[in-house]
């Protein structure tokens, strides 16, 4: 999947179940990786709580961060949409 597909799929997962384990885990991972000067502290054992398909999305998000794409406008826009969905969900 490319960047847009990964971000769109994550947003789709969150909108489908705003307070589900996968939604909140993916949101926490994205939020953690959004601070460029942060240390990206995330409890990887949380990945055990989600399905293999959702872990694939998490790995995709990690790859985007490794490529420096976690500072892109599309990342920030998706994160804002996710925050809004969770807040209003």
Where are these regions (language model features)?
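Positions within ordered alpha-helical repeat solenoids
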Residues: 16, 32-35, 67
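Short, hydrophobic/amphipathic alpha-helical patches that form generic packing surfaces
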Residues: 25-36, 60
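Short, charged early-sequence alpha-helical segments and their helix-coil boundaries
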Residues: 40-67, 73-77
């Amino acid at each position: 999947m490319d960047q847009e597909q990964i971000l769109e799929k994550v947003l789709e997962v969150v909108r489908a179940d705003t307070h589900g384990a996968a939604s909140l885990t993916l949101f926490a991972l994205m939020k953690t990786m959004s601070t460029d000067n942060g240390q990206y502290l995330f409890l990887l054992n949380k990945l055990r709580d989600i399905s293999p398909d959702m872990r694939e999305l998490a790995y995709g998000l990690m790859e985007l961060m490794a490529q420096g794409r976690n500072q892109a406008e599309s990342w920030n826009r998706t994160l804002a949409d996710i925050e809004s969905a969770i807040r209003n969900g």
